[in-house]
């Protein structure tokens, strides 16, 4: 079973994440940041992963540390759950619309962390999350999950753009980690991801 749990405690945050790649899209998410909970719930439902996040952060200083550290821990728990990646699809791309907004995500779950992010936000999303933190969350996840991601978002509503990104990321990760080869091989000419 492709599951993992990681706890991380620093002077800024205390985070526990339980994660299953072979889930049904169920989540229990408490970050202390309601809009971020909503985005992670959208990611969970559309990835079909099961995700439990319990986070306490120094929110009196702002959401930065909490959002960044959740990205770090979620990337780490993803890597542990994936293991060697035997039989996975590895590559996936998806386009997800949300009303006037559109997010495109292309992934390689191949052990090489890299992010190309195109798109902008007009200001703090829902007045709470500074726009640069959306990209920073994905950077933190990608560095720790060792995934290459190309992400492009356009539209008018910052809420819709952000939600389309989280949904597209979830759908693409689900497709890339789906076991499609029954030969037990790692999908790499190197023999490892």
Swiss-Prot record:
Localization, UniProt: Cytoplasm
Highest taxon, organism lineage: Archaea
Keyword Thylakoid tagged: no
GO molecular function, one term: imidazoleglycerol-phosphate dehydratase activity
Keywords annotated in UniProt: Amino-acid biosynthesis, Cytoplasm, Histidine biosynthesis, Lyase
UniProt pathway annotation: Amino-acid biosynthesis; L-histidine biosynthesis; L-histidine from 5-phospho-alpha-D-ribose 1-diphosphate: step 6/9
Residue spans crossing the bilayer: none
InterPro entries assigned: IGPD_sf, ImidazoleglycerolP_deHydtase, Ribosomal_Su5_D2-typ_SF
Catalysed reaction equations from the record: D-erythro-1-(imidazol-4-yl)glycerol 3-phosphate = 3-(imidazol-4-yl)-2-oxopropyl phosphate + H2O
EC number(s) recorded for this UniProt protein: 4.2.1.19
Amino-acid biosynthesis recorded as keyword: yes
GO terms under cellular component: cytoplasm
Family: Belongs to the imidazoleglycerol-phosphate dehydratase family.
Protein name, as recorded: Imidazoleglycerol-phosphate dehydratase
